[in-house]
Design a protein with these regions (language model features):
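A short glycine-rich, Lys/Arg-flanked "PGG" loop and its adjoining helix->strand segment in the class I
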Residues: 99-110
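Conserved alpha-helix/loop element of class I SAM-dependent methyltransferases that forms part
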Residues: 4-20
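Conserved small/polar residues in nucleotide/adenosyl-binding loops
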Residues: 198-204
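Class I SAM-dependent methyltransferase SAM/SAH-binding core
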Residues: 36-64, 68-72
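Glycine-rich SAM-binding Motif I of class I
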Residues: 31-35
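Acceptor-substrate binding/catalytic loop of class I
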Residues: 140-155
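A short SAM/SAH-binding and catalytic strip from SAM-dependent methyltransferases
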Residues: 84-95
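Conserved class I S-adenosyl-L-methionine
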Residues: 113-135
Length: 205
C-alpha cells in the first residue's frame, strides 16, 4: 500500500475511535496503525500478530504486542475487554471469517473491519476481459501464492454479518474518505463508487 493510501486508511479508522479508547489491532503488522492511533487519539493499544519478525519490530517500537493467530487465540480474551477491536486487510486470510468476526465483537464493544472488495468494478472488469485473477497494489500475489483464502464482496460481507447476528453501524471507503451511516446494500457503494477496501463498524449484539 502506498504511503498516501495508508495515511487515508489510518485517518478513516481514527475518525471512528474516540480519544483514550482501549484498542486491540488483530494482525497489527509492524504496528504503524497503533502508533498513529496513539499519536492522534492517545489510545491504550495492543497488537496481535502471527508473524514473529513483525512482532519483534513492534516490540522494538515499544508497542505492546503478542504473537497470535486470529483464528485460534481470540478465544482467550474475556468479554468486552476492549472498547474497539480492529482487523485491517486480514479477514480474507482467516480460515473462519464468521468465527473471527463473532470473537471480535465479543471481546470489544465495537469492531472496525477492512477488507479488499472483490466486487469492485476494476476487479470485475479484469476478470471479464483478461479471464485471470487480478494483480494490483492491493492484491499483489499470484493466485497460487496468495495468503488470501476467502475473497468477498461488500454485499457478501453484509450477508455474513446478518447471518452472524452482527449489526453494521457505519461504512467508509478510501475513495471518498467519508463515513456514512449504514442503510443496507447499495449498488453504487458495492460496485461503482467503492474502492477495493471498505471499512465497517460493528457494534456488539
Amino acid at each position: 500500500m502506498s504511503l498516501i493510501n495508508e495515511k487515508k486508511d489510518f485517518k478513516i479508522i481514527a475518525d471512528l475511535i474516540p480519544a483514550n479508547s482501549s484498542v486491540i489491532d488483530v494482525g497489527c503488522n509492524d504496528g504503524s496503525l497503533l502508533e498513529f492511533l496513539k499519536e492522534e487519539k492517545d489510545i491504550n493499544g495492543r497488537g496481535m500478530e502471527i508473524d514473529q519478525q513483525k512482532v519483534q519490530l513492534c516490540l522494538s517500537k515499544g508497542i505492546s504486542v503478542i504473537e497470535g493467530d486470529a483464528d485460534l487465540d481470540l478465544y482467550d480474551y474475556p468479554d468486552n475487554l476492549f472498547d474497539y477491536s480492529i482487523l485491517t486487510y486480514t479477514l480474507q486470510a482467516t480460515k473462519s471469517p464468521k468465527n473471527v468476526l463473532s470473537e471480535l465483537v465479543r471481546i470489544s464493544s465495537k469492531a472496525i473491519i477492512s477488507f479488499p472488495n472483490f466486487g469492485h468494478w476494476k476487479i470485475a472488469t479484469s476478470l471479464l476481459i483478461k479471464r485471470k485473477m487480478p494483480i494490483s497494489e492491493k492484491l499483489s500475489y499470484s493466485w497460487h501464492e496468495t495468503p488470501n483464502l476467502h475473497f468477498c464482496t461488500i454485499n457478501d460481507f453484509i450477508d455474513l454479518c446478518e447471518e452472524a447476528g452482527i449489526r453494521i453501524e457505519k461504512q467508509a471507503n478510501l475513495k471518498t474518505n467519508r463515513l456514512n451511516k449504514f442503510y443496507g446494500k447499495n449498488l453504487l457503494n458495492s460496485y461503482f463508487n467503492a474502492v477495493s477496501y471498505t471499512h465497517l463498524t460493528l457494534p456488539t449484539k
